[in-house]
Each structure stands twice: as structure tokens, then as C-alpha cells.
């Protein structure tokens, strides 16, 4: 079933600002330990139902996907260009931000944010959780419009952590997106979702303390250009779908899937990150060089102005990332704007109409006269390496559907034949169990690194430990 959520009316903005200030003050009394799972979700609103293929939920959010301005990482441009002319290279950006929403319905049907407050017990003679002096900053990892990420070390247990320091605005208080990220992540316990250890609130900042993960999928692909080892692609994709299935069953969307938001540990574990930190913005009518990359993984329904978001939104991003891992280039690397992005999609999948995508003509930005009329192609014509891997093209084709209702759900994708050669025990793991606890499940050396990573009897992930990110 699909749950539709109506947006809040504009006249509530004033009340929302007052609520932000109240919640900001409440954060000074919140200090959560690693094992505290009682921090509740915030936003509450009405739900109705809708259908989507597999097991999906449609959500119409309070806001839309954010644009990020982060640390740059250079990526390769696809050679499959519908305009058949050279274009300037686009640089991908690393993001600390994105929005993700979980909504519940109150017994009265009215919208009323709720926060349950907890403080963490601590010894007066030892470093405390929830205190800024409990962590040592080691180096800056990235900086966004209102948040900075540092590599840090816990003085409590000596473990490495990632510190997201969010600068607070006096008038607005704690940003709802930061509250949302904290509330969601404290309730999500899964091996393939980044773990939130602690929350620190001061007058000027709100700091979210995460487990430290060595690199992300974007950097990993930059380090291994030309496409990843097929076995590693399968393990990364399996973990991505595992994490998404977990949050989708809880009516949570990630809404900003891209390689920069998928962390890779030194043992090869993939973890979903960046839940709700960014400020929300409208889908832009134009973009700038450091924003254009965020369009690469955005589905055509959103590009065309749809605001009825479902778990199918995330599944489009999965398809794009799957193709990129195999082919070694982004699936749809638009170079200019939304129009260009849609042209690249339609060149491969065909220009939609009411027969292939019922309801497309009602989308705000769909103007048939603006688009070249393309016929759909086999995906291997665009990305030839899909044909080298059993069942890869079929799975990609079921994820990269223009009509959101036709996209495979995360749970259904896990049962696809593409994964049929993996050990059955992978489907029996508990949520917090890593896939690498199953015998014989391990990453393979990427091209050219066998001697470097395995010749000295080292674990695979040690080659990543010196990555700067």
C-alpha cells in the first residue's frame, strides 16, 4: 500500500517558526547514548492509500529534494551523448545533506509534532556522552551551506567518529531537517544504515555524532575507474537494497540516493547516510555547475514536477547507481538543466506518452512539444557492460522505469534472479548482521589492485584506509 501525505498550508509557517525555537530549546536537554532507541520521530500528519508495484509507499512530503553545495569530486562523463557534441566536464560534489521524512498519524488526525526527551546518565568522574568536550576534532572532511563535517575521536571509548556540526540560526532555532535526521536515525538500527552515536547541543551548534566510515561509493568508483568488479557490484547493490527495504517498510524515504551518500567501510560494508540534514528547496527551473550533479539520480516524475513521492523515487536512484557501478560512468549525466536531463533519459527509455506512462500529461512540466520523440532501446545499447553480467540488464530495466508505479520495489529486487548465485543465508540475516559474517562472502580485488591489496595478505579494506575524504 502507498501512503499519501498532504503538505502543510502556508499559513502555518509562523507557528512552525515558534515550534522550531521551542524544539531548539528542548535539544539542550537531549543527550542520547548509542543504545538509546526511544528518540521519537517528529512530524505527524494524515495518511491515505495508493498502490505501487512490489511493496512501496507513496508520500507527498512537506518539502522537496534539496540541492547540495559540497566538496568537489571529479567524475567521468558518459560517452553516450544524445546531442553528439562535446560538452564541458561536470564535477560531482560530495554531500553532507539530504532530506528524508517519516510521518505518523495522530489519534485525532491533526498534525502535532512530538518529541520525547531523554538524558543520558553519566559518571561525574568520566567523559560524558552529549558533551562537546567528549570528542576531539582531528580534521575537516567537508563543509556545506550551514554544516561542517569533521573526523573525530571519542574520549569516552577512543573510537573514530564523524562529527556533523550544524550552525544554528538564532531566529529559527534548530532546523527541522536536523531534528528529522536525528529522530529518524535514532530509531533505525541496521547494518546498512549509518549509526548515530550521540547528539550534542550548544547555543551556537547542534552536533550529530556518527560512526566513522572510511570512504563513499563515489570516491571508491573514482579510485577504480572503468567499472567495478561484477561480484563487488552485486554485494554493494545487495546491501543498498537491504538498507532501503528496511527503511521503506517503515514508510521512510531517503530521497537523495547518489554515490556520495553511500558510505563504504574498510571491510566493504555499504551504509546509507545523510538523512534529512539539508534545507529543503523547490525543484529548480535552472541549475548551476555545483548543483547539476544532483539531477543525475533524480527520477523523471520528479523532474517533471510531481510532488507525490513514493519509495519508487528511491528505486530510480538505485537503477542509476547500479548501471554506474557496472559501466563506470554515470547513467544520465545531464550537462545543463532539467530539460537536458530528461532528454538523456528519454533517449534511452523512450519519450513517454499516456500509453507508456498514464498520467504523464498531467505533470506540471510535461510539454510534449519540448521533447524529441525517441523510441525505447535495449539498455545494453546504451551501456554495453550490462550484457556481460547475467540478469543485470533485466534488473536494471525493471528499476529504470519512467512511470514510478512500474519500478521494482527494494524487497522485490532482492528476490531478482541477479542475486540467485549468492548464499541463501544472506536472506536470513538479522537487521544488524553484516553480510560479511556469512562464510565466503567477501569483496574481490578490483582491476589492478590484486598485488597491492591481497599480495601482502592484507584485508581488502585496508587499501581504503588512507583515502582522504
UniProtKB/Swiss-Prot annotation:
Tissue: Highly expressed in brain, pancreas, kidney, heart, testis and ovary. Also detected at lower levels in other tissues except in spleen and thymus where expression is barely detected.
Compositionally biased intervals (Polar residues): 456-469
Record Pfam families: Pkinase
One GO cellular component, as annotated: cyclin-dependent protein kinase holoenzyme complex
Source taxon at top rank: Eukaryota
Broad class of enzyme this protein falls into: transferase
Effect ascribed to mutating residue 164 to R: Abolishes protein kinase activity
Chain segments carrying region Disordered: 103-133, 449-469
UniProt-recorded Gene Ontology molecular function terms: ATP binding; cyclin binding; cyclin-dependent protein serine/threonine kinase activity; protein serine kinase activity
Entry EC no(s): 2.7.11.22
Cleaved signal peptide residues: none
This protein's UniProt keywords: ATP-binding, Cell cycle, Cell division, Cell membrane, Cytoplasm, Kinase, Membrane, Nucleotide-binding, Nucleus, Phosphoprotein, Serine/threonine-protein kinase, Transferase, Wnt signaling pathway
Main location: membrane
Sequence positions that bind ATP: 141-149, 164
Residue numbers annotated as active site: 256
Residues modified to Phosphoserine: 24, 78, 95, 134
Regulation (activators, inhibitors): Serine/threonine-protein kinase activity is promoted by associated cyclins CCDN3 and CCNY and repressed by CDKN1A.
Catalytic reaction annotation: L-seryl-[protein] + ATP = O-phospho-L-seryl-[protein] + ADP + H(+); L-threonyl-[protein] + ATP = O-phospho-L-threonyl-[protein] + ADP + H(+)
BP-aspect Gene Ontology terms: cell division; G2/M transition of mitotic cell cycle; regulation of canonical Wnt signaling pathway; regulation of cell cycle phase transition; Wnt signaling pathway
PANTHER family per record: CELL DIVISION PROTEIN KINASE, CYCLIN-DEPENDENT KINASE 14
Record function comment: Serine/threonine-protein kinase involved in the control of the eukaryotic cell cycle, whose activity is controlled by an associated cyclin. Acts as a cell-cycle regulator of Wnt signaling pathway during G2/M phase by mediating the phosphorylation of LRP6 at 'Ser-1490', leading to the activation of the Wnt signaling pathway. Acts as a regulator of cell cycle progression and cell proliferation via its interaction with CCDN3. Phosphorylates RB1 in vitro, however the relevance of such result remains to be confirmed in vivo.
Quaternary organization: Found in a complex with LRP6, CCNY and CAPRIN2 during G2/M stage; CAPRIN2 functions as a scaffold for the complex by binding to CCNY via its N terminus and to CDK14 via its C terminus. Interacts with CCNY; CCNY mediates its recruitment to the plasma membrane and promotes phosphorylation of LRP6. Interacts with CCDN3 and CDKN1A. Interacts with SEPT8. Interacts with 14-3-3 proteina YWHAB, YWHAE, YWHAH and YWHAQ.
Protein name in the entry: Cyclin-dependent kinase 14
Provenance organism: Homo sapiens
Lineage: Eukaryota, Metazoa, Chordata, Craniata, Vertebrata
The gene coding this protein: CDK14
Amino acid at each position: 500500500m502507498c501512503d499519501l501525505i498532504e503538505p502543510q498550508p502556508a499559513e502555518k509557517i509562523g507557528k512552525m517558526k515558534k515550534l522550531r525555537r521551542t524544539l531548539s530549546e528542548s535539544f539542550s536537554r537531549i543527550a542520547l547514548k548509542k543504545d538509546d532507541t526511544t528518540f521519537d520521530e517528529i512530524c505527524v500528519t494524515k495518511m491515505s492509500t495508493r498502490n505501487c508495484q512490489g511493496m512501496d509507499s507513496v508520500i507527498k512530503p512537506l518539502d522537496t529534494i534539496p540541492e547540495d553545495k559540497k566538496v568537489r569530486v571529479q567524475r567521468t562523463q558518459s560517452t553516450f551523448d544524445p546531442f553528439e557534441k562535446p560538452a564541458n566536464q561536470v564535477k560531482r560534489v560530495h554531500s553532507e545533506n539530504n532530506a528524508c521524512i517519516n510521518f505518523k498519524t495522530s489519534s485525532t488526525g491533526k498534525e502535532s509534532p512530538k518529541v520525547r526527551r531523554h538524558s543520558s546518565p553519566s559518571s561525574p568522574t568520566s567523559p560524558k556522552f552529549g558533551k562537546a568536550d567528549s570528542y576531539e576534532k582531528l580534521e575537516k572532511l567537508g563543509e556545506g551551506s550551514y554544516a561542517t563535517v569533521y573526523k573525530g575521536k571519542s574520549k569516552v571509548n577512543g573510537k573514530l567518529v564523524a562529527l556533523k556540526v550544524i550552525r544554528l540560526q538564532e531566529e529559527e532555532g534548530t532546523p527541522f531537517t536536523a531534528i528529522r535526521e536525528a529522530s529518524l536515525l535514532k530509531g533505525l538500527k541496521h547494518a546498512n544504515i549509518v549509526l548515530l552515536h550521540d547528539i550534542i547541543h550548544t547555543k551556537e551548534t547542534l552536533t550529530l555524532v556518527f560512526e566513522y566510515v572510511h570512504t563513499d561509493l563515489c570516491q571508491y568508483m573514482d579510485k577504480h575507474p572503468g567499472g567495478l568488479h561484477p561480484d563487488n557490484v552485486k554485494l554493494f547493490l545487495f546491501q543498498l537494497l537491504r538498507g532501503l527495504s528496511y527503511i521503506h517498510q517503515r514508510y521512510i524515504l531517503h530521497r537523495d540516493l547518489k554515490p556520495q551518500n553511500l558510505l563504504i567501510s574498510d571491510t566493504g560494508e555499504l551504509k546509507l547516510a545523510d538523512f534529512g540534514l539539508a534545507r529543503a528547496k523547490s525543484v529548480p527551473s535552472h541549475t548551476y555547475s555545483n548543483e547539476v550533479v544532483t539531477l543525475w539520480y533524480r527520477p523523471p516524475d520528479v523532474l517533471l514536477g510531481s510532488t507525490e513521492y513514493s519509495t519508487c523515487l528511491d528505486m530510480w536512484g538505485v537503477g542509476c547507481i547500479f548501471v554506474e557501478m557496472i559501466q563506470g560512468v554515470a547513467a544520465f549525466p545531464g550537462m545543463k538543466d532539467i530539460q537536458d536531463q530528461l532528454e538523456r533519459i528519454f533517449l534511452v527509455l523512450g519519450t513517454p506518452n499516456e500509453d507508456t506512462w498514464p498520467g504523464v500529461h498531467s505533470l506540471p512540466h510535461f510539454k510534449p512539444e519540448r521533447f524529441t520523440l525517441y523510441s525505447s532501446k535495449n539498455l545494453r545499447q546504451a551501456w554495453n557492460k550490462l550484457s556481460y553480467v547475467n540478469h543485470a540488464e533485466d534488473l536494471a530495466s525493471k528499476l529504470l522505469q519512467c512511470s514510478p508505479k512500474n519500478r521494482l520495489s527494494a524487497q522485490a529486487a532482492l528476490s531478482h534472479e541477479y542475486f540467485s548465485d549468492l548464499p541463501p543465508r544472506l536472506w536470513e540475516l538479522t537487521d544488524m548482521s553484516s553480510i560479511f559474517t556469512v562464510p565466503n562472502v567477501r569483496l574481490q580485488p578490483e582491476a589492478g589492485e590484486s598485488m597491492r591489496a591481497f599480495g601482502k595478505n592484507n584485508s581488502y579494506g585496508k587499501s581504503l584506509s588512507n583515502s582522504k575524504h
